């Protein structure tokens, strides 16, 4: 068995614009995102920390690092899922988010679960 099969977390992200909290006249665009992590590997693994790279439509980059997600450091058994929602505020109506979760397997091995890039976009802005 290869290491990539033994230690694997799949990350799925869905984002949506939140018009009620946004104010385009003030360059404030609020987005909610919903994340699902699935342990598709063969050993239990705990989410230790996160690293986000958030890029707005003007190319401005913010990096966010911290322990856990929404105050939790969930342990995922093989086949188990963990979902959560959070948000991000941009100064432009479009942007992207990507990054990684730092994981610790039950056997002590540490690895990153990549968060594929996903789009943040106010409806009717992209054609």
UniProtKB/Swiss-Prot annotation:
GO biological-process terms attached to the record: error-free translesion synthesis
UniProt xrefs under InterPro entries: ApaG_domain, ApaG_sf, Uncharacterised_ApaG
Pfam families: DUF525
Domain ApaG span(s) in chain numbering: 3-127
NCBIfam families per the UniProt record, alphabetical: PRK05461.1 (NF003967)
Family matches, as HAMAP family: ApaG
Protein name, UniProt field: Protein ApaG
């Amino acid at each position: 068995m290869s290491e990539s099969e033994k230690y694997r977390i799949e990350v799925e992200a869905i984002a949506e614009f939140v018009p009620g909290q946004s104010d385009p006249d003030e360059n404030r665009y609020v987005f909610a995102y919903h994340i699902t992590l699935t342990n598709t590997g063969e050993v239990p693994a705990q989410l230790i920390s996160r690293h986000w790279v958030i890029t707005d439509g003007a190319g401005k980059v913010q990096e966010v690092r911290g322990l856990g997600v929404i105050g939790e450091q969930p342990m995922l058994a093989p086949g188990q899922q963990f979902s959560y929602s959070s948000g991000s505020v941009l100064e432009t109506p479009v942007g992207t988010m990507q990054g990684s979760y730092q994981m610790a397997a039950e056997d002590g091995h540490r690895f990153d679960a990549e968060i594929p890039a996903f789009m943040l976009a106010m409806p009717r802005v992209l054609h």
